[in-house]
Each structure stands twice: as structure tokens, then as C-alpha cells.
């Protein structure tokens, strides 16, 4: 059957009329993402409904709750302002009349297949993302959309909420906070329940960039580099020439992996190291001395001095890079080596207040040094669980992070939707590369679990 997605409506949802204008300068945490591709995510919900119910009840309620959520998250409805005169500085701005572009659609694609964990063609998911708004011009500024939504009905089966955001808007904690607030307002408790649950000011977002201590003007250092890079309209990486698969690590798997590390390891370290070593073992091993890099992101809120509040909305991500020779990761004890390298970076830098921002002025040049090297990154975190965003339909059935389609290579990481304490790893790779990874993943998890390992069928991409 030919699958199609039909656009039923396009509209713009503003916050309530009383909203005040707001301008936010980009911190050095924000501005480094200026030319980064949009972050694209899909949330699938099992919520059978008819087209009539969808259009006349569900969609109007989602629009209303989105508008109310924007009351507390004004930047989401705004734009990124990029100066035509690069002596000025980019900023986020909400002005009266700004809004979130929303697309309403219907799909006859196979909902069960899309929400599965088996190998699926990556291109088909892009029908569920909102169109990319063009860059607009205003006086001395270029206006770039920073958030867009598409709500797609699968009649009688479920709903997909697809959204894309410019990374300058905020990191995972911030975006998950907004989506969760939208869901909470849309749910059973409504706006009154949301206000009651968030009566403490510390539970609502703050946008004050004065919390970011930048005495060395790192923001200006980054802008001096980034303003020389041509501004381009975002595009979808189609055709991707990739497939997507989800790999499950149950809690028992993670605990057994922890026992195989040389030093005590967290669940994140165990999962990340395992995937990293499997990627290397299943990839090109022609040069054993070549460096393999793993980028470890961490939320700096509460880790820096003075601390940045947890309800700070924006970017606050610090990254560290674990580096190991390819041959060592491809060896039999490659997982333990990977865990030691990742754990060492976390303990030595990311958990050390004196080290976490050391050399921050060199972040841009450090990024450029990684170009052309073999790198694995991470998108998402079980700590900021989008699957729990409940619009009144229960937790999401599946999260797909489409952003990783445009990277070589990155893994998505989230809590398991089916097994308490488990983790789901999402990958986007060429088909043959995915098959090679799957084979190594299966063999390695069985070896780590020992002879009492459960049925091999459970270690396939689920």
C-alpha cells in the first residue's frame, strides 16, 4: 500500500494577548549552536480516535493548551534574530504577533511499524515533521523560526506529535520542560491543575541570562568565529540512505555490564561504553592506531560556581571528549576500556567544579578539530524523559530522534517505554552498517550475560 500524509490544516498559535515582549541575548552556551541543524523529535501516542473526533475535539484542545503553555514559555513562540550587521549580536525575541507554526495532518502509514524497534527506512518519518519555515527579513535582522509542531492522526490507532526546535532555544532539559508543560495543561487537570502544581516559582522557567557568568566574554569569542559562517536555511537530510533501529538494554543487562567495568560505573557509562565499543567493533578497523572519540554531554546546572538554577530555560550543556585508540576499543576488553575512558572524563571534568568550564573559550576550535574524525555523540538523556510527557493519553509509546540522521554518528538515549530501569538506544545507519552493528550487539550482550542468557530473540533490536 502506498503511504501518504495529508495536510489538513496549517495555522499559527500565539500566547494569550496579554503577553509582553521579551528579548534574550544568547549566552556562550547558546551561541555555539547557531549553525547547528534543528533538533527534530517525534512522540508517538497510542490513542485511537476518528478523524472527526481528532479535528473537532483533540486538535482544538491541543491548540488551546499550547497557547496557555506559551504564557510561561514565551521564547518558544518567538524567533532567533540574526543581525545583518555582524557588529551586532544575535538574540532570541518574542514580540506581539509572534506564534508557533502548527501543521495538522493525517497519515495512512503503518502505526505499528513506525513505533516498532525493528529496522525501518529512515526517510518515511519526515512526513511527520512540520515544514521548515523560511528565513524572514526585518530591518537589520534575519528572523529564524525556532519552534514548529506537526500533529498527525493515524485514524483508529494513534497520534504523533512531531516538533523541531533551533538548538539556540534550549537544551534537552528546557525543551522537555516545555513539552511536558503543554501536555500537563492539555491533560485531565487542565490549566488550573498546572498552576496549582507549579505554584512554586522555582518550578516555572526563568530566562535571565545574568545567571551565566562570563567574565571573559566567551560569547563574543564564539560570535567572532560564527559570524564568518554563511547563514543557511535548514533542510531535511533527504534521502538519508539510512535505516533506524532501537536497541534495548534491560536493567539486568545494565547491571551485568557494570560488573565488567574496571571502576564503578553508572547506567549511562555502562550503556554508552557498550554502544561505543560495539560501533567500533562492527566498523572499519583498518587503522588500529586511529583515534575514536566519544562526546559526553552534561547539564552544567548545579555543577558550576555560582550554580545555575535548575529551572533556567536555555542551553547549559558542557561536553567532554573521551578518546581511545581504535584497536583498543575493538579488542575483547574494548567495553571495559570504553567505560574507563568515559567514566574518567565524567569524574575528572564534568563533576569537577574547577574543571568543568576550564578552556571554555576554546570550545569552538575544539569542535573544528573533530571534523573528519571518527566520532560518536549522544542525543537525549533518561534524566529528561520525553516519554513521560502526558497529553491526557498516557505516556508516549515511542520517541524517535530524527536529528541523528544528519550526523556521523550519534545515538539517541532514553528510558525504556516497556521495562522499568531499562534504556533504549536509537541508531540511524546505512543498512549494511546497521546489520553489522546488530550482529556485534547481539553477540556482545549475550557474552556479557553469560551462559544463562535469555532467548537470543530478546537481544535483537526490539
UniProtKB/Swiss-Prot annotation:
Keywords: Acyltransferase, Phenylpropanoid metabolism, Transferase. The keyword Acyltransferase applies. Completely inhibited by 10 mM p-coumaric acid, this inhibition is rapid, reversible and non-competitive. Completely inhibited by 0.1 mM Cu(2+), 0.1 mM Hg(2+) and 10 mM caffeic acid. Partially inhibited by 5 mM N-ethylmaleimide, 1 mM diethylpyrocarbonate and 1 mM acetyl-CoA. Optimum pH is 8.0. Active over the pH range 6.0-11.0. Stable at pH 7.5 for 20 hours at 20 degrees Celsius. Changing residue 45 to A: Activity reduced to 11% of wild-type. Stable below 30 degrees Celsius for 20 minutes at pH 7.0. Changing residue 166 to A: Activity reduced to 23% of wild-type. Detected in petals and sepals, and at lower levels in bracts and red stems. GO terms for molecular function: anthocyanin 5-O-glucoside 6'''-O-malonyltransferase activity. It comes from the Eukaryota. Its EC number is 2.3.1.172. Pathway: Pigment biosynthesis; anthocyanin biosynthesis. Changing residue 171 to A: Activity reduced to 0.8% of wild-type. The keyword Acyltransferase applies. Changing residue 150 to A: Activity reduced to 67% of wild-type. Catalyzes the transfer of a malonyl group from malonyl-CoA to the 6'''-hydroxyl group of the 5-glucosyl moiety of anthocyanins. Active towards bisdemalonylsalvianin (pelargonidin 3-O-(6-caffeoyl-beta-D-glucoside) 5-O-beta-D-glucoside) and shisonin, but not towards nodemalonylsalvianin, salvianin, pelargonidin 3,5-diglucoside and delphinidin 3,5-diglucoside. This is Malonyl-coenzyme:anthocyanin 5-O-glucoside-6'''-O-malonyltransferase. The gene is 5MAT1.
